[in-house]
C-alpha cells in the first residue's frame, strides 16, 4: 500500500505526517435514462388542421386596424397543393433530364439588350413654361395691447347694437348681448338652452374664461343684482360674482353664468350637479315654457292620421320651415311680444290681406329648393298667396253705377245695386253675401230672358253654312313632348285613368260572334249600321267598291230643323252644314279603323290611338253611350295630373245625370260644367256628329265609322262650339235631339236601384262578392277595386268572416288613405266598417269567454 506525506501548518511551524489512503472498491451499474416525452405532441396533433390552414392563409387588415387571417377553403387548399406538387414534379423531371447544349440565348426571339440603337430625335415642345410665383402673405400679429384694444372695441360695438361674438377655441362659444335685469349684459348659449339636459351645462377652457371676463364688463357690470330677481329667460347671462347678492352656488373667475335654481339656490352653469338635482332643477330658459306648451297641447290638438307617421324629415329643417310658416301667417319680431300681437290684431282686413299676400310670397322665395321636400308648406303658401291677392277695385266705376241707379230699389236695379256693392267689397265678402249675389244674378238672368223676344229674320232659302275645307290646328296633337318617335300621341297617365271609361261604358268585341253582331247600333226611333264589317277587307276590287257605297237613307231638305238661332241671328256652329247652293251636306261612307279615336269634322279627320284597355281586344261603346266618345276626345286636352279627377267626375257626376239617350242640350251643359273645372278642354276637337232629322237623333261617329249614309252633318267641331247648345234662349230643334241608344241597356250609375242585378252595367251581386273575396288576399286587385268601385266595401257586412279578413289585411285603412282627400263619404264608410270589425272581434271574444265559463 503506498504511503503519502501530509503537511499541516500551525502558524510558522510545519508538521509532516505520513498516511495511507484506504482503497475503495468500484461497482459498475448501468444508469437508467428516462425516455424523452414531447409535451407539445398532443397539442400539435390538435392544431395540425388549423396550422395547415394557416400555412396557406393570407393576412388582411380590418377597418379598425386589426390584422387577421383570411383562410382558404378546403377546395382552394387542395388546388394549391396540387399546383405545388405539379411544380415539384416538373422541377424533378427537369433535373433528371439529359444534358443539352445551349448555343444561343434570346429574349422572346428579339435583339440582345447589349445591341446599340440609334437615338431618336425628341419632339420640340412649342409651349412656354409657366413660372408660378408663390405669394407669401405677411402674418398679421398683434401685440398684447393691440389685442386688448380690439377686444374692448368689439365689446363696445356689439353691446350697443346687441350683437353677438363667437369665441373660437377647441369649441365655439357664442356670446350674445341682451337687455337683461335692467342692463345690457353678455350671455352665453348653454346646453339646456339647446334642449340638452346635462350635469355640466356649460364648458369652456381658461382662454375662453379670460375673454369672457373682458367681454362681460359692460356699463352696469358692478351694479348689485339679487338672486331673487333672476327669472325665466335669463339662462346663460354672465353676472359679477362680487356684486351678486343672495343664495347661490359656487363659481370661478369672478363670473357667475346663470343656469337655474333648485330649492331657492341659484346654480352656475359650469358647476357639476347631481342627477337628482338635475331632474328637479328649474332652468331659466324661455324654451322650456315654449316646449312645455307645445308638447302639452300638440298631441291633444292634432287630428287623426290615416297612416303610420315616420320621422322622414330632418328636425332642423322642420324647425326652419316652422319659423318660415310662422312669419308668413303671424309675422312678429319676437313671439313673446304683446305689442306685435296688438299691432297685428288692429290691422284692417284689407291691410291684413295685403300683408299676408306679401309675406306668403316672401315665404315661397325663402322656401326655395326645399319646396320639393316640404310640398305641403309650398302648397299652403301658394294657396295663401292666391287667396289674399289684392283685387284692383275701380271706385270710379262704382260711383258711376251708383249715380245711375243707386236710388232705384225696384227690380232689376235692386239686384244690380247688390252686385255693385258685392264687387266693391272684393274678397271681404262673407258666404252669405256670396249667396245673395248669386240669387241677384239669377234674378237678372230671368229678367233678361223674359224681356228678350226672339225675332224671326230672313228666309231659310238664303241660309248658308259651309263646312271649312281646312282642318283645325290641334296644339295638343302637335306638341313634340306628347308624341313618340312615330308622331303618335302619347296618353301617359291618361291611358291608365281612361280605363274608367272602358270598364263601364264600352264592350269588348268578341271575335267568336263576328263583326256582323256589332253592325247595328240601336237608337230610340230606329237603327244605324256601322261599317265595322268592312274591317274584313275583300280582295276583289269590284266587291270592295260596292261596300264603299254604303246604305243611303234619305233625309229631309234644309229647313228650320237644321238651324239654331238666338235673337233672330243664326248660331252657325249649332246648325247643319250646307253646300254653296244651300242644300245640306250629306254624310258619306265612313270607313272603320282599329283602336283609333277619330276626331275633327273639317278637312281631314285625325286618327288618335285609343288608350289601351284591360285587354288587347277591340272596344265599342255600349248601346246608348255613344256620347262617351266626346269625353274621351276631351281627355286629350287634359293634363296627366288632372286625368284621374277628370275621369272620375265624368263617371260619377256627368254620366249619372245624362244616363242613356240624353238630349244634346244636356250633353252640352255637362261639357260646360267640365270646362269650368278644366279650362283646357275649350278647344278640344270632337268626333264627327251626324244629325238624323227623321228620328231626331244625333250620332257620334266612332272608330267603326258608319255604313249608313245621307245624314246631315253638324258644324260644331270643338267643345266651346258644342257648349252653345246649353242655352235656354237658343231656338233650335237639334238641341232637343237625343244622343245615344236605347235607355234600358245601361242603368244610370247614380240610380238608387241596385247595380248588381243580372245584365247590369257592373255585375251581379254574387259576382261582386266573389270579386271582393278575390281582392282580400290580392293587394293589386283590391287596390284597383277600391279605385274603380269603392262602394263594394259595403258587401263585407254580409259575413263577419269577410269583415274580419278585410280588417286584418288593412283594406279599410287603405280605402281611407285613397279617398280621404277625394270623397269623404267613402272614407267615412271605410272608417265605420273598421269600427264594426273591432266590435265583431270583441263580440267573438265575449262569446268564447261565455262558452268557457259555461263549460266550467
UniProtKB/Swiss-Prot annotation:
GO terms for molecular function: cysteine-type endopeptidase activity; serine-type peptidase activity. It catalyses: Hydrolyzes a Gly-|-Gly bond at its own C-terminus, commonly in the sequence -Tyr-Xaa-Val-Gly-|-Gly, in the processing of the potyviral polyprotein. It is an enzyme of class 3 (hydrolase). A motif (Involved in virions binding and aphid transmission) lies at residues 592-594. One of its GO terms (biological process) is proteolysis. It comes from the Viruses. Its EC number is 3.4.-.-, 3.4.22.45. Signal peptide: none annotated. The record marks 284-285, 740-741 as: Cleavage. Residues 141-284 form the Peptidase S30 domain. Keywords: Hydrolase, Protease, Serine protease, Thiol protease. Coiled coil: none annotated. The active site is at residues 192, 201, 235, 626, 699. Residues 618-740 form the Peptidase C6 domain. A motif (Involved in interaction with stylet and aphid transmission) lies at residues 334-337. Belongs to the potyviridae genome polyprotein family. This is Genome polyprotein. The lineage of its organism: Viruses, Riboviria, Orthornavirae, Pisuviricota, Stelpaviricetes.
Amino acid at each position: 500500500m503506498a504511503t503519502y506525506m501530509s503537511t499541516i501548518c500551525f502558524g510558522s511551524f510545519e508538521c509532516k505526517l505520513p498516511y495511507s489512503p484506504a482503497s475503495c472498491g468500484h461497482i459498475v451499474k448501468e444508469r437508467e435514462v428516462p425516455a424523452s416525452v414531447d409535451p407539445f405532441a398532443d397539442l400539435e396533433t390538435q392544431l395540425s388542421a388549423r396550422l395547415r390552414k394557416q400555412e396557406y392563409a393570407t393576412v388582411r387588415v380590418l377597418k379598425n386596424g386589426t390584422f387577421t387571417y383570411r383562410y382558404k377553403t378546403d377546395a382552394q387548399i387542395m388546388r394549391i397543393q396540387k399546383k405545388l406538387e405539379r411544380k415539384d414534379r416538373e422541377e424533378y423531371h427537369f433535373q433528371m433530364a439529359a444534358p443539352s447544349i445551349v448555343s444561343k440565348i434570346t429574349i422572346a426571339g428579339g435583339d440582345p439588350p447589349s445591341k446599340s440603337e440609334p437615338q431618336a430625335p425628341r419632339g420640340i415642345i412649342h409651349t412656354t413654361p409657366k413660372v408660378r410665383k408663390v405669394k407669401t402673405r405677411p402674418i398679421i400679429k398683434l401685440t398684447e395691447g393691440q389685442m386688448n384694444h380690439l377686444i374692448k372695441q368689439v365689446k363696445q360695438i356689439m353691446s350697443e347694437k346687441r350683437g353677438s361674438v363667437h369665441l373660437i377655441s377647441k369649441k365655439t362659444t357664442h356670446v350674445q348681448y341682451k337687455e337683461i335685469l335692467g342692463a345690457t349684459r353678455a350671455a352665453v348659449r348653454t346646453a339646456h338652452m339647446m334642449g340638452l339636459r346635462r350635469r355640466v351645462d356649460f364648458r369652456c377652457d381658461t382662454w375662453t374664461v379670460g375673454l369672457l371676463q373682458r367681454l362681460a364688463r359692460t356699463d352696469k357690470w358692478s351694479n348689485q343684482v339679487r338672486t331673487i330677481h333672476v327669472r325665466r329667460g335669463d339662462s346663460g347671462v354672465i353676472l359679477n360674482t362680487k356684486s351678486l347678492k343672495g343664495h347661490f352656488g359656487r363659481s370661478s373667475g369672478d363670473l357667475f353664468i346663470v343656469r337655474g335654481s333648485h330649492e331657492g339656490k341659484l346654480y352656475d352653469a359650469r358647476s357639476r350637479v347631481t342627477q337628482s338635482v338635475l331632474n328637479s332643477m328649474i332652468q331659466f330658459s324661455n324654451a322650456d315654457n315654449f316646449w312645455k306648451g307645445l308638447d302639452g297641447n300638440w298631441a291633444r290638438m292634432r287630428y287623426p292620421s290615416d297612416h303610420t307617421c315616420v320621422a322622414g324629415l330632418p328636425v332642423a329643417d322642420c324647425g326652419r320651415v316652422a319659423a318660415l310658416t310662422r312669419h308668413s301667417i303671424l309675422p312678429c319680431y319676437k313671439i313673446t311680444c304683446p305689442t306685435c300681437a296688438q299691432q297685428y290684431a288692429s290691422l284692417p282686413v284689407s291691410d291684413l290681406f295685403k300683408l299676408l299676400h306679401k309675406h306668403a310670397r316672401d315665404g315661397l322665395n325663402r322656401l326655395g329648393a326645399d319646396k320639393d321636400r316640404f310640398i305641403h308648406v309650398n302648397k299652403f303658401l301658394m294657396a295663401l298667396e292666391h287667396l289674399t291677392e289684392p283685387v284692383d277695385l275701380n271706385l270710379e266705376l262704382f260711383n258711376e253705377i251708383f249715380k245711375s241707379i243707386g236710388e232705384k230699389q225696384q227690380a232689376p236695379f235692386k239686384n244690380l245695386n247688390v252686385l255693385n256693392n258685392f264687387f266693391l267689397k272684393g274678397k271681404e265678402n262673407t258666404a252669405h253675401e256670396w249667396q245673395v249675389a248669386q240669387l241677384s244674378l239669377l234674378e237678372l238672368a230671368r229678367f233678361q230672358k223674359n224681356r228678350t223676344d226672339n225675332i224671326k229674320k230672313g228666309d231659310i232659302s238664303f241660309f248658308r253654312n259651309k263646312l271649312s275645307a281646312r282642318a283645325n290646328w290641334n296644339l295638343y296633337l302637335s306638341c313634340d313632348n306628347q308624341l313618340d318617335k312615330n308622331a303618335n300621341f302619347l296618353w301617359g297617365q291618361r291611358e291608365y285613368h281612361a280605363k274608367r271609361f272602358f270598364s263601364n261604358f264600352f264592350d269588348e268585341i268578341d271575335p267568336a260572334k263576328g263583326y256582323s253582331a256589332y253592325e247595328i247600333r240601336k237608337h230610340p226611333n230606329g237603327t244605324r249600321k256601322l261599317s265595322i264589317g268592312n274591317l274584313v277587307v275583300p280582295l276583289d276590287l269590284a266587291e270592295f267598291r260596292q261596300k264603299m257605297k254604303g246604305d243611303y237613307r234619305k233625309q229631309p231638305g234644309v229647313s228650320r230643323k237644321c238651324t239654331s238661332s238666338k235673337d233672330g241671328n243664326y248660331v252657325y256652329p249649332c246648325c247643319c252644314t250646307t253646300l254653296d247652293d244651300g242644300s245640306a251636306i250629306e254624310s258619306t261612307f265612313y270607313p272603320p279603323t282599329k283602336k283609333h279615336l277619330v276626331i275633327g269634322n273639317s278637312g281631314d279627320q285625325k286618327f288618335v290611338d285609343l288608350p289601351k284597355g284591360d285587354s288587347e281586344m277591340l272596344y265599342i261603346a255600349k248601346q246608348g253611350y255613344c256620347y262617351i266618345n266626346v269625353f274621351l276626345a276631351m281627355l286629350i286636352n287634359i293634363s296627366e295630373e288632372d286625368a284621374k279627377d277628370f275621369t272620375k267626375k265624368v263617371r260619377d257626376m256627368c254620366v249619372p245625370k245624362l244616363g242613356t239617350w240624353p238630349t244634346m242640350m244636356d250633353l252640352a251643359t255637362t261639357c260646360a260644367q267640365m270646362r269650368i273645372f278644366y279650362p283646357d278642354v275649350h278647344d278640344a276637337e270632337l268626333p264627327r256628329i251626324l244629325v238624323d232629322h227623321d228620328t231626331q237623333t244625333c250620332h257620334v261617329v266612332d272608330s267603326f265609322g258608319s255604313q249608313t249614309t245621307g245624314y246631315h252633318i253638324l258644324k260644331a267641331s270643338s267643345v266651346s262650339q258644342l257648349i252653345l247648345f246649353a242655352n235656354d234662349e237658343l231656338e233650335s230643334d237639334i238641341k232637343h235631339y237625343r244622343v245615344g241608344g236605347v235607355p234600358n241597356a245601361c242603368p244610370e250609375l247614380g240610380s238608387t236601384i241596385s247595380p248588381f242585378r243580372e245584365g247590369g252595367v257592373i255585375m251581379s251581386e254574387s259576382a261582386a262578392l266573389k270579386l271582393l273575396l278575390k281582392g282580400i288576399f290580392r293587394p293589386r286587385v283590391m287596390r284597383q277595386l277600391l279605385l274603380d268601385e269603392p262602394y263594394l266595401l259595403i258587401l263585407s257586412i254580409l259575413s263577419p268572416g269577410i269583415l274580419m279578413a278585410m280588417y286584418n289585411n288593412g283594406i279599410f285603412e287603405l280605402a281611407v288613405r285613397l279617398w280621404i282627400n277625394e270623397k269623404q263619404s267613402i272614407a267615412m264608410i271605410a272608417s265605420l266598417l273598421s269600427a264594426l270589425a273591432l266590435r265583431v272581434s270583441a263580440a267573438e271574444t265575449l262569446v268564447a269567454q261565455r262558452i268557457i265559463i259555461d263549460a266550467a
